[in-house]
Amino acid sequence: MFYSCCVSIEPRDPASEPTPTPRRPLRKSQPRSFSQAQPLSWAQLESVLSGRGAGLRNLRAVGVGEGQRRTTSLDPAEAEGTGAEGASQKGITTPFAELHASSAYNFLRGASQPEQMVEAARELGLSALACVDRDGFYGAARFATAVAESGADLATVFGAELSLDVPLTVLCKGREGYTRLSRVIADARMADPDKDSVRYPSLPQLAEAAGGHWLVLLDWRRTDAQLVDFFGADNVVVELQHTMNPADADRNERLHALAVRHGLREIVSSAPTCATPKHSRLAGAKAALRERKDMAAAEPTTHPVGGSWLRSGEEMLQLAGDCEWLARAVETSVQVAEECAFTLDLVAPNLPHFPVPEGYTEMTWLRAITERGGAQRYGPRGSSAAANQAWATIDRELETIEQLGFPGYFLIVHDIVSFCHENNIFCQGRGSAANSAVCFALGITTVDAVASGLLFERFLSPERDGPPDIDLDIESGRREEAIQYVYSRYGRENAAQVANVITYRRRGATRDAGRALGYAPGQIDAWTRHPEQTPDVVQNLAEQMLDHPRHLGIHSGGMVICDRPIAQVVPTEWARMEGRSVVQWDKDDCAAVGLVKFDLLGLGMLEALHHAVDQVRAHRGREVELWRLDPTESEVYAMLSRADAVGVFQVESRAQMSTLPRLKPRTFYDLVVEVALIRPGPIQGGSVHPYIRRRNGLEPVTFDHPCLEPALTKTLGIPLFQEQLMQMAVDAAGFSGAEADTLRRAMGSKRSPQKMERLKKRFYQGLEAKNGIRGVVADRLWDKIVAFASYGFPESHSQSFASLVYYSAWFKYHYPAEFCVALLRAQPMGFYSPQSLLADARRHGVEVLPVDVNDSDVQVDAVASLATPPRTNRPTGVHGLGRGTGEPVGQIRLGLSGAGGVKGISAEVAERIVEARERIGRFTSVEDLSREAGLTVAHVEKLARAGALGSLGLTRRQAVWAAGVAATERPGMLPGTSGVHAPALPGMSAFEMVASELATTGVTTAEHPVQLLREYLDEWHLRPAPRGVHPGDAAPRGGAAVVTADSLLRVPDGTRVRVAGVVTHRQRPATAGGVVFFGLEDETGLANIVVSQGLWARQRAVALNAKILVVRGIVHNAEGAATVTADLLEQVETQLRPAGEIAGAHAGSRDFR
């Protein structure tokens, strides 16, 4: 191997070495004989190349060869006291600036997070650091934040590497250089709609764009001084490199000669792609992935040891040895850094000035429209005591808004909301904005903050750093209209969406680690399914990748707007979705630099509610205004208390439906609590069960300390909301409002564990100083706060969501047919599939009519019944909800397309069918349909198999036969001139009909699949068990019979039962300790199944793959909600042929969402 001649150990007597001095004097280069150097042993070489071993940092120059070429050696005598840890021990005095580093935000190039790079630079005593990314400033804000938070005396230099024919590294000279480079990168990325394309102008044009405000680095990849001709000698710096690459010496010699010839300054860099040697192997893995190779295949073009790392000034001088020009380059690096360094907050923008009517300022206009809206919401000033209280709150809020200079922010949000209202788009503000009476008066939120007693300070306070945060929920189907309105209103250059940095998670990291190490794709897939089988070498590499950025995504709805082109602050690029541009920073980075974010979030339930309002208007003749609904209807709360909540916003999950019968909500505030209760924060904080016990009078209301009573009284001494945790910090630990807000932000931040650790010491000190709280009580209080780092809700957020809970429950109770149609039209959304939603509607007395070319619309629709008042008697029961009796309370007709429609029939084809029917009247034959609607054979066959041709007098099999006629029928042909009449064909069995419906539409209209299997299931315990299921093999199973889901609540608690159904979902919550929860559905309703870790391991194949299950287990129903803790799972479709037909056509469950 060639490494052994380039990397060596120089034999010497450590005792004879002089004591290291802080700075070595420059001496003339004197070559030493390489014969005096001793080659590395194989063990040492392997240690270097693999990234292991204490001596990895301690490679130093041993001599200057011909032409002053440098080689390196491993110096055991200096093994101690070097590196990031030892550097500080030796008292570094050699200034050095690393100006060409790459963090992990240089995607698939850097191997250390910006925080790690900054920490290493601080320990090494660097004067300045530049973290450059390829074609962007992806990590610039996080780098700047890391430096600010570290407290290090480290200057920040910003730059980027541009993807020209030969890559060009550019450093910005201060703020002006940064804005010019950001603009150039944005133009290059936006020049082509292809997101992955970058089109830079020519070098002369780049030099013109720089205007003398860039320094360009001339490194080994360029062999001429062309850059000098375009940028000028003062703006070109030669970059020499010490990277442990054997080619460094020759490259540096050529570059030095070029610098001398043209009078250019020289700097030196280790071109680090990681912070410390231990990350170099990861750098090599990422480099291989970048080239779409494994590490072995990429070896010829990647770094010999994976990557280089940060080095101190002393180390760089050691590497320079006796070479004067290399040593001078260390010093010059600091001078160049001083020329370029600046802090990123200098580019912070402002919001655009909002256009207001003549004679108004932004503040006076905000007061005017608030006055108008407040009169509508609360009544005129002085009209009542309640109105006076509201106006006093509004005036106080407006004073704070004026004091902080945020009127423009509120005007922009109001403008977006007004656009939605004017265009009949449902929207509402949520989150902390619901704490504001001004937001309520402006129509931004639907929660009355005054009546609800919400604190404005949670939303906005004088101590707050930065603007408030208003999230707008917009009906998902029309959110794009609002986004495009923002682009058109404020300009494409001044508005963009916020990025979401996609980071490595366990499965993705395992995949990429396996690829980098050269394993076969099939083997890697197996490891992602069975993580416990992953080899240590893959696991170790994958562990290093976790949480590293992989690529750029797009935030679900965050937009930034500013008073100048955003590209002057951060480059923009095209998003994957057409018509959207995105900045290169996530929401935290945008906030850190002062870009104000507006969240325009798509919410499926708002779309569903809009459809529900439209359906009731069209088919019942009633205009429903959501905000006028009476929130006290006892029947609606009684329905929810029975866990009759399929399709109801936020409370339809397994956990929520198990909680509803125990909580028994009776008031709107109970819904507020219900929304907040089943969240990771309250669950991890141990709040759920104590609250319910106290709510039901089974446990006394107590407080950990009397000082907590003001904050926790309304939730019975149990913390549920973020506002309460803030108040606890103020009352118990003496936090200021600003400190409490900092704590609250740490709760919701992605980086909250680190931030909250820094607050812990302050919290404990405050507890003892103010209230004498210490020990177990102090720990308990801190644990409750830490639990909310897993995203507990703010109360204002729960208030907003509770409104949607009530609205959706109201529609479900009064108009079940229209509500089901609304949910189907808003798909995909929610917890349940269209099949489950329709099955639930049938259990509530709704008749589901099949798809038909003569009766169906493009989408599913309720059947008009203007004379029929809504039914107020609902089926009873829990889970199963009972079977509806009597006349149907409504009818649903499946559509030709969309949810419940015919698979393979697009909306465009469905519109052609409806248009043809409206033009000529009802279709009378397949030929008629095909000709007038211009359908293909494939279209007609799909309609035939779905039973959509039933009104033509054809069975499904006859219709499929007749579909071939469509091949010759086209518009303009004489009717009846083609085709052959279908012969007599046998009908389909009930099982075949259900399987056909599931295969073609994904839903059944009449019978639930399990209903057809009931006669088999009733005898399940009498049937022989297949081999391997029971010890008796072919002996009867024995034991409990199969019961229906709706009977589980009536079975004595602790009884062993069997229950059967179609698997609707599988869940493994992070807070459940590995337990998996199943949903089973039969013709009577839903059953909750608990599968332990052990049972999952024993029956993994059945548990993971079965579509229809018989579950044996113990019923737990003592608290009003029934669950079955499974001890045996049996896959029905493998044991009953009819079940196999159904399972083969079933779309499957919604797993692990």
UniProtKB/Swiss-Prot annotation:
Subcellular location: Cytoplasm
Catalytic reactions of this protein: DNA(n) + a 2'-deoxyribonucleoside 5'-triphosphate = DNA(n+1) + diphosphate
Documented EC number(s): 2.7.7.7
GO biological process: DNA repair; DNA replication
A Pfam family the protein falls into: DNA_pol3_alpha
InterPro entries: DNA_pol3_alpha_NTPase_dom, DNA_pol3_finger, DnaE2, DnaE2/DnaE/PolC, DNAPol_HHH, PHP_dom, Pol/His_phosphatase_N, RuvA_2-like
Signal sequence segment: none
Keyword DNA repair: yes
GO terms, molecular function: 3'-5' exonuclease activity; DNA-directed DNA polymerase activity
The keyword Transmembrane helix is assigned to this record: no
Cellular component annotations (GO), alphabetically ordered: cytoplasm
Cited SMART domains: POLIIIAc (SM00481)
Region (Disordered): 1-39, 64-89
SUPFAM superfamilies, sorted: RuvA domain 2-like (SSF47781)
Family: Belongs to the DNA polymerase type-C family. DnaE2 subfamily.
Role, per record: DNA polymerase involved in damage-induced mutagenesis and translesion synthesis (TLS). It is not the major replicative DNA polymerase.
UniProt protein name: Error-prone DNA polymerase
Species of provenance: Corynebacterium jeikeium (strain K411)
Lineage of source species: Bacteria, Bacillati, Actinomycetota, Actinomycetes, Mycobacteriales
